[in-house]
């Protein structure tokens, strides 16, 4: 007979539980994975990848953007500035300093999902998602359905320079390399010679050895891993998403097989950028930005963390950790 530790906090949900089971649940696993992997209940895992109830809760942390517009820049990206305009492709959830730049006390990463850029009723958006590497908060989103991959590369490099933070070179850039991603990569690295980029790792190798191939490549397995990591990031507050559209798009991902995830192409008018068919582009861009939180180049962030963690974003993992630390004192 097993005896639980004194004062153990039981979860009363009419399921067989144990300390090990409770620890696994607290890791932030999605409900469908708990049902499938822990309860061995494949019917309970359902067909939607992201839990609808959790997405509804996440919408409570979404905000209207602080600013909307676009970046203006010269040919060499030496002068990059923000130009405010209603209906612009770039939305900011961060304040700019007196000279019109984002905080220089943080570092940033940008996730990119690249579409063909063929404008039309069923066109998919190309999306750039900007995240603070210190707080995990999404601070900006660029979305356009009529920007070709090579032009998106130019916009991405400009945005990297705009969100260069404490670096002299710019934000860490990660993109999906499939399809039009190849043209994007060539423009970023060869034409604009931007090299602060993600190099994919072998998902099969235990040590996840870094390869010499830039960009993230999507397969059934790598997509499942990426979106699972992203779901955990959302659930634990390590990735704080402020975009209503981005959170709602998560609800369109479903299982079409035991381990295959696809986006259900839903026609609608909820997308303010004009793309009548949403292909989950924001979700992939956000998931890649989330990947960058743990896979960017090692930087000395101690001083920056100390400054930023003194007032972390509400609802973030950092805020909850700070509250736990205060309770222990």
What are the roles of these predicted feature ranges?
Residues 1-110, 236, 240:
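Non-catalytic, compositionally simple segments
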Residues 42, 54, 59, 114-118, ...:
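Short, flexible loop/turn elements at secondary-structure junctions
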Residues 103-133:
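Gly/Thr-rich phosphate-binding beta-strand-loop-beta motif of the actin/hexokinase/Hsp70
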Residues 106-107, 123-124, 145-156, 223, ...:
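Phosphate/oxyanion-binding active-site loops and adjacent basic polyanion-contact surfaces
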Residues 113, 176, 281-284:
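Acidic active-site catalytic centers that drive phospho-/nucleotidyl reactions
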Residues 132-262, 319-329:
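Mg2+-dependent endonuclease catalytic cores in nucleic-acid-processing enzymes, primarily RNase H-like
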Residues 260-276:
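Short, solvent-exposed helix-loop connector elements
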Residues 280-282, 287-329:
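Acidic two-metal-ion nuclease catalytic site recognized across multiple nuclease folds
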